[in-house]
């Protein structure tokens, strides 16, 4: 119960250890200190500034804790030795040390950098290794590694458990001192590597390993178990984690990459050979992919497939391959680290995987399965050096009579033809010529475009901003939105459309994405002039399949249900989206076949895929052959989008090829051969003319003094003729090709084996294939032959699939990273806590930490400990954003630092927060987590109610003491956006403007009439500027110009802030209510007895979440649609051009100025003038003119209630909940009822989480006439707009206010 208070004390101790001479003691909500660094003074000295005080004196005083500025203590960050003070010796660090290589042993193009020793002197390979280390050993994340170490050391003291990670880190610091230095303001700055270039990765591994161990410690304590179980065998989770950690040490990412599939395979196949199996049974809709699933309880069933599993060659081979993989990883690790360690626990489990029982009712089994899926996060993101390889043209399978290449190609063609026809019947057409330019805006994302554009930005502040427009700064951007706005009119020109990207002058550039565990993914940044023709022809497929559902029965001709792309199965909750996997994994007749293709994209050759795809598209385009796009036919557009030198046989620039050669051989080259061409070599690499010379030099190198060379003439560009993962049609084309292979598999199996196996369902998502089948033979030989046939078809289709990764099993399903086993969910928690894909630039501290609450809630829903999550969140709440201020000084008030001042130069103000800030409402400058359960949001009304609840007293007492004592939080997004602007014209606007806007702009008479309408930024005359400005604010380089200006605004905010000034407001903004509104009414609580406990698939949950699921149950019906603002938003989403620019609030604000009484046709015209498409404008106006909207113009601010992944899977905010738990006056409007819904949802979740009997909540007005009169007045005022509006609107539009006034009399 008192965890929050204990956790806060623990975090305070961690903060006091991290910041020397600070005193964070819980007596106030924030702590201000100074930090001193001499770097600034050194820089200014070089420019001529003279200081009286000596830097060394200031540093000595700081280090001794005697330095103060304006009565504030100067603190310093703790050293590694201060944090890791325990003296330990570990054999694991010995393994790491023995694996460290000299720089001479470098393999320049190895995928993952090995552990190389730091070399202090000059070395020809040093710069290259350091450059790779800086990229590949990056951590990023949101907290410095020292902060993690500090809080983990305190958890270790509290729990008296010492994880291996912390011991290895202590040993490293004891032996070698500082591993690296990380800047606390910008976490991406890692310098001064100590002893080994991979030390940042080692420490990230130590931290993640420790978190995994502590998670096990807390989870086992919550479940009151001493160990995990594999069948009846006792498994020590700490030993299981440690054996994995130590095997990975010699070359972490490579070894983990090898071990990744055996661990997943083990979980999927655990217990599938047992003769009796316990399952969570469920019933569902007719189709196997139905999401309407009801869970009925656990029972034991016979395993019809057990004999096949135990005797079949496939299962023997599969196990053997996974054993071999594991042993290979161990041998590699032993050789590199010169050690004799193995993985006894995992190998023992692997050997007995089929016959050891998995019991879904035993939490010790479920946690072990989950741990095996999560353990791989230890080595962080798989940042790799991806060699720029060309397609292997020789190895590509050509059509012949003994393979299925042509057949698959033909099926792919037919699938495309059928898909277009189906999409057309579903109301989707290709982009028409008149909409061509408008549709280009679909591509206006924040991703790289393959082009770049220069924009003049005017900065209206700072020393050089002299009046008027301000200081002009030129920025270069590659993001698609800005490129389209400034150069969109050039995309579709003959020059750009005819350009072939297959020479060293014209080529395209690859990008990359880092993903946890797996190796870096290549992303092809395809040029916009290629994407636009692709968009025109493939739009109907993307649109249709993103929303079409349907049957997954193989006999069904429609493909809508079988091809699952887009948001069709992404409601935001795994447990709801994957309901079909839980149901099918509990069906004793079902045999799942989930095929895992290796490198699917690189096997999509012209022969088995591209020719068929293009023939299919051409065939489907025949009906549109009369259309002309700027004079071009659709056949020409297909050529521009997919033709030779556009996508087929294109050259791509990626990483330079790097070769290790002898220095003297390089010196002997002629000057001509050493000249640098167009392509710059990486840091620390010498230029050589071409790749041929590099290869010759490499052959001659024989261990003499070595250097690195790279070709610089473009001879190392990669020629690619396969599918590219950045095409507009990537996902849908992959799925249609996959369906073609799946069809051949089904046909061949049917032809040879008749009814021995029946296919019940087929689903395709990109390269994922999932079949639900029923085996009607018990012959082991027949089964093996069926499996052989499947793999043979795949091979003959020109693809590869591995037996060791393909799942063919009863009682087990895996679909898009969701694992289901015997009817329950085995969560795979691969959410990274310590590291992140890229640098986090946190602009809005409160917004970021609110999103962290959601992230941690999702993590808890996947088996993470609630208590540990709260401690981590409190640490993050205290520290994130503590060094945002750069030039602020506190001297009585807040002001800018005096420049070149002896007293102030080198000092920066830092603001630390008390850990309890995590649990205050956002409105009171807190982060809105609730101590009872992370998925409950601490709104103001919830805070007040929690104080009144007896069961919450222990949490709330310390919170009440410091109520509303937190100053405003840093939020750059609230900076005045007008401080930057641009005069770069949006040349593209005239092309993309819709007919109504074009008419207004070209007809002066109409234009004059429109000017009188209150459309503000969205009038036809301003809209291009508004869109340009909005796109500009998405460009990081432009946004960073706002930061210095915001600091001044923030100083004023701090200056004006006073503690304990907050009021409890029933309405948040004008005409907007929140759950606070409920505090106006009387709320009665009637306990409901006799409610049965529910069954649900996600059983690996901490007590706080488990109780909510047991009492409230899994969601069984769709969530009730919230306020009409949501409805307007969903209509606006139908307009691909203006969505994101025009929101429901924009529409409501305009309607408030105009009134709602206009006819639908008037409103349609109005919306068309705002550049909305005619269909969306019509839907919107029809919706707005309906009666119910006129009587309910209130907005509801949900504040994120029930918006996280876990709450989405609970039976809250549904009609069932309303019927069971709510009684409210019939006079309430729709918005008021929505507020009741959210209010009660929070309370029933809190009741469940704290172990109370569920209750019904009766909302009512008071029986006391005087109180009732006050409630009426308050309610009436809420429904009234401000007086300036009232004059316009009171007659008819505000019937809602009149109606409300006459209720509850």
Curated annotation (Swiss-Prot):
It comes from the Viruses. The keyword Transcription regulation does not apply. Disulfide bonds: none annotated. It is an enzyme of class 2 (transferase). Keywords: Nucleotide-binding, Nucleotidyltransferase, RNA-directed RNA polymerase, Transferase, Viral RNA replication. GO terms for biological process: DNA-templated transcription; viral genome replication. One of its GO terms (molecular function) is RNA binding. It catalyses: RNA(n) + a ribonucleoside 5'-triphosphate = RNA(n+1) + diphosphate. Its EC number is 2.7.7.48. Residues 563-814 form the RdRp catalytic domain. It holds the Pfam family Orbi_VP1. Belongs to the reoviridae RNA-directed RNA polymerase family. This is RNA-directed RNA polymerase. It comes from African horse sickness virus. The lineage of its organism: Viruses, Riboviria, Orthornavirae, Duplornaviricota, Resentoviricetes. The gene is Segment-1.
């Amino acid at each position: 119960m008192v965890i929050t208070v204990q956790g806060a004390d623990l975090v305070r101790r961690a903060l006091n250890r991290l910041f020397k001479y600070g005193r964070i003691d819980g007596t106030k909500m924030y702590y201000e200190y100074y930090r001193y660094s001499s770097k600034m003074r050194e820089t200014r000295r070089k420019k001529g500034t003279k200081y009286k005080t000596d830097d060394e004196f200031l540093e000595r005083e700081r280090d001794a804790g005697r330095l103060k500025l304006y009565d504030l203590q100067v603190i310093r960050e703790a050293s590694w030795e201060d944090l890791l003070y325990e003296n330990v010796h570990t054999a694991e660090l010995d393994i790491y040390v023995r694996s460290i290589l000299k720089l001479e042993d470098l393999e320049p193009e190895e995928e993952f950098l090995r552990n190389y020793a730091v070399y202090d002197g000059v070395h020809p390979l040093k710069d290259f290794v350091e450059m790779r280390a800086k990229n590949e050993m990056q951590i990023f994340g949101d907290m410095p590694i020292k902060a993690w170490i500090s809080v983990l050391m305190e958890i270790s003291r509290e729990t008296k458990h010492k994880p291996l990670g912390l011991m290895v880190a202590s040993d490293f610091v004891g032996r070698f001192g500082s591993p690296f230095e990380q800047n606390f303001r910008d976490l991406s700055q890692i310098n001064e590597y100590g002893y080994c270039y991979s030390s940042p990765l080692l420490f990230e591994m130590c931290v993640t390993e420790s978190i995994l161990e502590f998670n096990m410690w807390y989870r086992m304590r919550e479940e009151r178990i001493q160990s995990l179980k594999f069948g009846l065998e006792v498994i020590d989770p700490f030993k299981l984690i440690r054996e994995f950690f130590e095997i990975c040490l010699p070359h972490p990412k490579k070894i983990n990459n090898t071990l990744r599939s055996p661990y997943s395979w083990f979980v999927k196949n655990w217990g599938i050979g047992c003769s009796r199996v316990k399952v969570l049974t469920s019933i569902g809709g007719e189709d196997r992919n139905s999401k309407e699933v009801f869970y009925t309880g656990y029972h034991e069933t016979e395993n019809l497939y057990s004999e096949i599993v135990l005797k079949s060659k496939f299962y023997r081979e599969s196990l053997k391959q996974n054993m071999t993989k594991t042993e290979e990883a161990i041998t590699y690790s032993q050789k590199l680290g010169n050690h004799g360690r193995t993985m006894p626990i995992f190998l023992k489990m692997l050997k007995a995987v089929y016959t050891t029982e998995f019991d879904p009712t035993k939490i010790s089994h479920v946690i072990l399965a989950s741990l095996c899926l999560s353990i791989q996060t230890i080595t962080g993101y798989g940042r790799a050096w991806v060699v720029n390889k060309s397609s292997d043209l020789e190895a590509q399978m050509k059509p012949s009579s003994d393979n299925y290449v042509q057949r698959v190609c033909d099926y792919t063609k037919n699938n495309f033809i059928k898909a277009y026809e189906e999409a057309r019947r579903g109301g989707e057409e290709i982009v028409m010529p008149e909409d061509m330019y408008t549709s280009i805006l679909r591509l206006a994302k924040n991703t790289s475009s393959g082009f770049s554009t220069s924009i003049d930005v005017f900065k209206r502040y700072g020393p050089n901003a002299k009046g008027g427009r301000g200081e002009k700064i030129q920025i270069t951007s590659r993001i698609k939105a800005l490129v389209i706005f400034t150069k969109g009119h050039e995309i579709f020109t003959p020059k750009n459309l005819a350009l072939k990207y297959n020479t060293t002058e014209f080529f395209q550039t690859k990008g990359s994405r880092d993903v946890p565990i797996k190796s870096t993914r290549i992303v092809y940044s395809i040029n916009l002039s290629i994407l636009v023709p692709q968009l025109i022809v493939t739009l109907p497929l993307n649109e249709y399949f993103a929303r079409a559902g349907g049957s997954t029965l193989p006999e069904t001709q429609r493909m809508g249900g079988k091809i699952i792309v887009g948001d069709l199965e992404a409601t935001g909750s795994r447990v709801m989206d994957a309901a079909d996997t839980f149901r099918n994994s509990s069906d004793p007749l079902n045999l799942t076949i989930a095929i895992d293709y290796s490198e699917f994209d690189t096997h999509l050759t012209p022969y088995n895929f591209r020719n068929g795809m293009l023939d299919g598209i051409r065939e489907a385009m025949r009906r549109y052959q009369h259309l002309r796009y700027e004079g071009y036919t659709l056949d020409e557009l297909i050529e521009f989008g997919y033709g030779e030198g556009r996508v087929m046989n294109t050259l791509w620039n990626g990483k330079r090829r790097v070769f290790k050669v002898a220095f003297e051989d390089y010196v002997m080259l002629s000057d001509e051969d050493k000249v640098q061409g167009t392509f710059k070599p990486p840091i620390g690499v010498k230029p050589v003319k071409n790749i041929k010379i590099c290869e010759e030099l490499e052959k001659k190198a024989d261990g003499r003094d070595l250097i690195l060379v790279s070709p610089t003439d473009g001879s190392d560009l990669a020629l690619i003729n396969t599918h590219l993962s950045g095409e507009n049609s990537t996902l849908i084309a992959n799925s249609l090709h996959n369906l073609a292979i799946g069809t051949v598999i089904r046909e061949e199996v049917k032809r040879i084996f008749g009814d021995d196996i029946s296919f019940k369902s087929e689903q395709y998502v990109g390269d994922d294939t999932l079949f639900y089948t029923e085996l009607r033979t018990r012959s082991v030989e027949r089964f093996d032959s069926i499996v052989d046939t499947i793999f043979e078809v795949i091979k003959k289709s020109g693809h590869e699939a591995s037996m060791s990764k393909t799942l063919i099993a009863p009682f087990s399903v895996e679909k898009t990273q969701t694992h289901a086993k015997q009817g329950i969910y085995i969560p795979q928690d691969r959410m990274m806590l310590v590291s992140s894909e890229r640098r986090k630039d946190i602009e809005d501290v409160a917004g970021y930490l609110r999103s962290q609450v959601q992230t941690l809630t999702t993590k808890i829903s996947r088996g993470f400990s609630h208590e540990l999550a709260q401690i981590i969140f409190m640490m993050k709440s205290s520290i994130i954003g503590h060094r945002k201020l750069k030039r602020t000084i506190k001297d009585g008030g807040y002001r800018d630092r005096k420049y070149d001042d002896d007293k102030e130069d080198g000092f920066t103000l830092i603001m630390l927060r008390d850990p309890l800030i995590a649990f205050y409402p956002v409105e009171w400058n807190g982060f809105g987590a609730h101590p009872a359960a992370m998925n409950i949001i601490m709104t103001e009304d919830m805070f007040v109610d929690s104080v009144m609840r007896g069961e919450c007293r222990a949490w709330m007492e310390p919170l009440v003491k410091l109520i509303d004592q937190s100053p405003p939080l840093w939020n750059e997004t609230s900076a005045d956006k007008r401080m930057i602007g641009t005069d770069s014209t949006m040349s593209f606007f005239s092309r993309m403007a819709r007919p109504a806007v074009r008419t207004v702009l070209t007809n002066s008479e109409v234009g004059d009439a429109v000017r009188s309408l209150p459309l503000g930024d969205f009038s036809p005359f301003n809209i291009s500027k508004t869109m340009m400005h909005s796109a500009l604010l998405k460009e990081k380089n432009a946004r960073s110009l706002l930061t210095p200006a915001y600091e001044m605004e923030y100083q004023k905010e701090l200056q004006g802030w006073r503690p304990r000034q907050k009021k409890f407001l029933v309405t948040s903004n004008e005409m907007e209510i929140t759950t606070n509104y409920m505090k106006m009414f009387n709320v009665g609580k009637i306990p409901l007895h006799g409610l049965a406990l529910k069954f649900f698939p996600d059983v690996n949950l901490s007590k706080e979440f488990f109780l909510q699921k047991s009492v409230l149950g899994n969601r069984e019906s769709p969530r009730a649609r919230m306020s009409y603002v949501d409805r307007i938003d969903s209509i606006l989403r139908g307009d691909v051009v203006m969505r994101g620019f025009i929101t429901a609030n924009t529409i409501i604000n305009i309607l408030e100025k105009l009134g709602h009484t206009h006819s639908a046709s008037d409103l349609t015209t109005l919306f068309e003038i705002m550049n909305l498409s005619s269909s969306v404008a019509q839907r919107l106006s029809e919706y707005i003119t309906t009666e119910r909207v006129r009587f309910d113009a209130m907005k509801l601010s949900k504040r994120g209630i029930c918006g996280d992944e876990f709450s989405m899977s609970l039976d809250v905010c549904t009609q069932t909940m309303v019927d069971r738990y709510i009684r409210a006056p019939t006079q309430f409007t729709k918005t008021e009822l929505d507020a009741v819904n959210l209010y009660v949802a929070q309370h029933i979740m809190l009741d469940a989480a704290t172990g109370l009997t569920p209750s019904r909540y009766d909302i009512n007005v008071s029986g006391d006439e005087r109180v009732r009169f006050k409630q009426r007045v308050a309610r009436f005022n809420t429904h009234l707009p401000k007086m300036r509006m009232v004059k316009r609107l009171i007659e008819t539009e505000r019937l809602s206010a009149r109606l409300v006034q006459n209720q509850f009399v």
